[in-house]
Design a protein with these regions (language model features):
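Acidic, proline/glycine-rich low-complexity IDRs
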Residues: 1-34, 38-44, 69, 123-184
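Amphipathic, interaction-prone secondary-structure segments
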Residues: 58-100, 182-184
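Charged, low-complexity, helix/coiled-coil-prone segments
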Residues: 1-5, 49, 85
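Intrinsically disordered, low-complexity regulatory segments enriched in Ser/Thr/Pro
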Residues: 86-135, 178-184
Length: 184
């Protein structure tokens, strides 16, 4: 069986509402293993995803308190690069359309200077992918899956801090492949 990136993307989207971060990541890793059998997938399962998600959940609110936008935030974009760099940006509008990021580019947008997440897990995924030669078979899906969980935790924390605000979010690679979190 060859590695089907479309299928793994669909798996991530299908299971995105799993509240147990470690269980979600194990589900994604198991699907990856089915398509690209390799004993080293177990190394990715050993990472402590939940602890870091909890520790980074406050990042968005903390940064926006220091680097406030000049408008009321409505849309949140969590962008990923191919090397596991995850950052966030906010805009004054949001469109919950899986194939459309115009809302982030055609609206007032704020890219906080300190918007990048300092994630050891994302760096560990990249290092393990390189060391085990799983490379993009691990990086693409696990960056996206874990980035999604960081985004969800950040949005949940934001909603706790600002329950009256209606916000939406999406996450994906700057080069494409978007998962829409929707309105919260």
């Amino acid at each position: 069986m060859s590695f089907d990136f479309v299928k793994i993307f669909e798996t991530i989207d299908l299971h995105k509402n799993d509240l147990d971060v470690d269980n979600f990541m194990t589900t994604v890793i198991n699907h990856c293993h089915q398509m690209q059998p390799n004993k080293n997938w177990e190394l990715f399962k050993a990472l402590d995803y939940t602890t870091e998600v909890k520790s980074l959940a406050t990042h968005v609110v903390n940064i926006l308190e220091k680097e406030a936008s000049s408008f009321s935030e409505q849309g949140f974009w969590f962008g990923l690069s191919d090397n596991g760099y995850l950052y966030f940006a906010v805009s004054d509008r949001y469109i919950a359309d899986e194939d459309n990021l115009d809302w982030i580019f055609e609206a007032q947008t704020h890219y906080p200077e300190e918007g990048a997440f300092d994630s050891k897990i994302l760096r560990n995924i990249e290092d393990l992918a390189d060391e085990t030669e799983l490379d993009n078979y691990a990086e693409y899906p696990l960056f996206l899956a874990y980035g999604l969980k960081l985004a969800q935790a950040s949005i949940n924390h934001y909603k706790t801090a600002y329950p009256e605000r209606k916000i939406g979010y999406s996450i994906g690679y700057d080069s494409g492949d978007i998962i829409t979190g929707g309105w919260v």
